[in-house]
Amino acid sequence: MNNSTKFCFSRFRTGN
């Protein structure tokens, strides 16, 4: 998993 993908995924989960 790339850093960008992890950041986006983490942000999406946190935002939801």
Curated annotation (Swiss-Prot):
Q: What are the alphabetically sorted keywords of the record?
A: Stress response
Q: What induces it?
A: In stationary phase and in minimal glucose or glycerol medium (at protein level).
Official protein name in the record: Uncharacterized protein IlvX
Instruction: Name the encoding gene, please.
Output: ilvX
